[in-house]
Amino acid sequence: EKVGENNVNIKTDSSEFQIVGQSGENFPVMNIVEENANKLSIEKEILKNMIRRTNFSASIDESKGVLVGELIEINQNDIRMISVDGFRISVYKEDMKNENLNDIIIHAKTLSEVLKLLSESDIDEDVELIIGSKEALILLDKTKVSIRLMEGEFIKYKDILPKDCNTRMKVDRKFLMQSIERASLMAKEGKNNLIKCTIDGNLLTINSRSDEGSVKEELIVKKEGDNIEIGFNSKYILDVLKVLDDEEISIEFKNSLAPC
């Protein structure tokens, strides 16, 4: 029940709410994307996977500029979504035919909200992405989401991706995740949740230690190349393992000091 210009009363058999509102004229108007904006259709499940598998490694530090966003590259034969937080890089590539479009950067928090929208929708149809010079629109069924694009130059991520490896390990994803979760119980937060991984032959040993005690986990793996001993922040590894669906995953190492 509307009361006066901007107030509303909501009544039930046993409750009554009085809500003070504001004039609808104060609500921000949705920005209009140019008529000549580029358009792209993408399967809903593909877009969900792209966001889910990259969103976790975008920076949450607003002082890092565009690193709080995710880069979307739309190439002739594929589309890629990239996030970087200064410690991790996530790149998701999906093969699909497109027109070559300009790269765009969208805030990771915005993409997280888009992921919620896609996950809650039971509409099984493609998502339309309309890209303007400063704004983008995401259209799904009767829902329209207006997004302000971020300005700035994204980090040249290809220059810092490992280009070769001396050790390759294949391992059951769930077993590895469970072992790291147990090892991380003793990983010291002040030491960046450090765990030590040693690959010797086809045996992976995971160790962690703190003032409260120590943990040792062993897993059988398939190894190619050199033996290696390397330390990791357990949280960073778990973040990756939790968004993957594969039963078996491959991890490549260059040496004990280089990223994997």
Named regions from a protein language model:
Residues 1-260:
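Structural preference for solvent-exposed beta-strand-turn elements
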